[in-house]
Amino acid sequence: MYSRIKNFINNSLFANNIDNILYMIMLLILSSAVCLKSDYMGALALLFSILTIFKSIFIQTKEKFEFKNYHKAILIFFLIVTLSLFGSTLFSLSFHGYIKTFIYILFFYCSSIFFKDNKNKITPTILFVSFLMSAESIIAIIQNNTGVLEISGWQDTTSINPEEVVSRAYGTLQPYNPNLLAGYLLCGLSSFVYLILNFLSKNKKKIALLFSILFLINLIAIIDTGCRGAYLGFLFFFPCLFLAIIYYVQKKFGGISNIKKRYKNITLAGVIGVLFFILTNPALIKRFESILAFREDSSISFRLNVYESAIKMFLDNPFLGIGVGNQNFREIYGLYMKTGFDALGSYCVPLEIAVESGIFALIAFILFLFLVIKFCLETGLKKDRTGKIETKDRILCLSIILMILATMGHGLFDTIWFRPQVQLLFWINISMLSALKIKIK
């Protein structure tokens, strides 16, 4: 009976077009990030996952899904989160957060299965992401230049002059929040790196120049959000990018001195342009300086107070945490918080994971990130047993490393990463690695 049903489904029009349907849903998920509420994104991610599971059960595919080490690590993380759920004193509230985590992890596995069968969809997907990023960046720059009204108290203005107040752009993402926009744009910043290097490798210099300009626009838009956590993300993103460029130039050309002068001038002009933009904007300079203000800045002082309370929560629940979800966090945080410092989260991704699911969940998540980066480095730097690794595969690995470093760097100072707009884009990026069927020496 099962075989008859399976044969019927495999010969159907639906089965012949299932990958196209799944891809359309994925593009809808990416599109919904810029204009719809989080619930719609979650529903689309769940629909994508259900159809992928249906495909895996009933529709024949050419190759089996390869369960890599980082897939195992994130599964261990999820199992620990499940234990944390059943150990939570507020099960119903924690269950709400658990369902979100379940959808994210399920979506990651299903996206991995999708890209395993559809490697040709990687570049179009990254192109689509870059289009969304560019549109949001242009909107953000317009908002900054026209002076948008603040939706909430986003900046400490007690010790700065009116001309030093940043008009913090927030784009169209919902809920309106400049930190959310910054996290979203930062997560997609590496998409431009992939496209620039990919087109350069094909000697399509004019197209690469176009995406270089869009990269700078995206960079300026992130700066215009005034998000200091994103600025910290830059400290992880750009050193890694520069090291990769130096490594490539040294290997390909024998050193920077052998690069043509016009390419050096273009790079120098881009760097000078961004520095000029920052140095001629006193509001941005003041915003950068405030990072080092610590207790003298009310926003940073608020975060430090939340950190102190969250650390106490972790120390009281070190192994399984309090249970996942910001509703659960807020209820228990009230027992620890300093008066007047209410919060929905700990404002630090590693601390949030430790508080919600315990030290073992944090170790499993860090192991997951380590294994992803390790796989990317091995793929990018070594040859495989079956022959030559494609250049675009190496570039993809670099872009994913940059994405992880940038978002996790931002995550040291904020928990925007847990928002669907950032989280789903994060998982889509990493799931692309499943398309690389490479055996490393």
Could you say what each language-model-derived stretch is?
Residues 1-96, 113-127, 195-209, 252-265, ...:
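Transmembrane signal-anchor hairpin modules in multi-pass inner-membrane enzymes, especially those
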Residues 26-30, 49-51, 82-83, 123-167, ...:
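Alpha-helical transmembrane segments of multi-pass inner-membrane proteins
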Residues 29-38, 226-229, 354-357, 388, ...:
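Membrane helix-loop boundary segments at the extracytoplasmic
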Residues 38-58, 98-107, 181-189, 232-239, ...:
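Membrane-embedded alpha-helical segments of multi-pass membrane proteins
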Residues 87-96, 173, 223-228, 412-417:
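Membrane-interface helix caps and helix-loop-helix hairpins in membrane proteins
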Residues 138, 144-147, 224, 242-296, ...:
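A membrane-periplasm/extracellular boundary helix in multi-pass inner-membrane enzymes
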Residues 294-308, 312, 316, 320-357:
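Long extracytoplasmic/lumenal interhelical loops at the membrane interface
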Residues 358-372:
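Hydrophobic alpha-helical transmembrane segments
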